[in-house]
């Protein structure tokens, strides 16, 4: 809770910057956040900007109807530890995981199936009917067990994205519910965060844009800008290599250069255009951001959020 309080104070005290440094730092301005949010809502209509309500807290550097993005009731069918365990099993890095799997197999083998003895009388048809009925009942019971287990594991999350003034990047908040709609405790929500990230990037906070107290888990944004900058650099290298290969091909086939006395005058514009083409558009920021978040919350079905209704 101390960390949460310090984070809130930092958000409050940090001045807002309106100077774009996206290409050099991976950070964005509030205006660029709105631009990226508009693109996300346009391409993936499950995401929406906030409603204007009396319960909202408003920050004056953002439009009142674009304070935060929200999507509700995103499915989460299993805990994050299950995904980590499966990865360990596939990579052969965890003997405990194998032991757990073996134990489950042994439990299945220990179930005793008692056959129904057939009568030696002429009532074979009746016995067959009973056998078939028992098989159908057994299948239905198995289906019920699987369904009940699935329902117990199923959770739903409301996801919120707002703008962090202290880090100048988007910040994610998650609020979870069980299958019956009962709010999850912070401890339960932590179960849906990858173990490696629980202590590093996840914090218990109340939603900062509501007046009422809504507990949530926030994904700390301290690394977002660095991740984005690395991605921008990689894109630039790839695009530069592609452009050089294209120029080499044109040179080999003797492609003519464009004529005109204003070629030198256009060089600066062409260089600027190449810089733009070599980078990621800022309106795609939140799409990339959500891909990063999937590594933190792998069992929350973010792919669902990238589809239309």
From Swiss-Prot:
The N-terminal region is involved in phosphatidylethanolamine-binding and is required for ATG8-PE conjugation. The flexible region (FR) is required for ATG7-binding. It is found in: Cytoplasm. Its main location: cytoplasm. This is Autophagy-related protein 3. Residues 226-284 are annotated as: Handle region. The keyword Cytoplasm applies. The active site is at residue 222. GO terms for molecular function: Atg8-family ligase activity. Residues 243-270 are annotated as: Disordered. The gene is ATG3. Pfam families: Autophagy_act_C. GO terms for biological process: autophagosome assembly; autophagy of mitochondrion; cytoplasm to vacuole targeting by the Cvt pathway; glycophagy; piecemeal microautophagy of the nucleus; protein targeting to membrane. GO terms for cellular component: cytosol; mitochondrion; phagophore; phagophore assembly site.
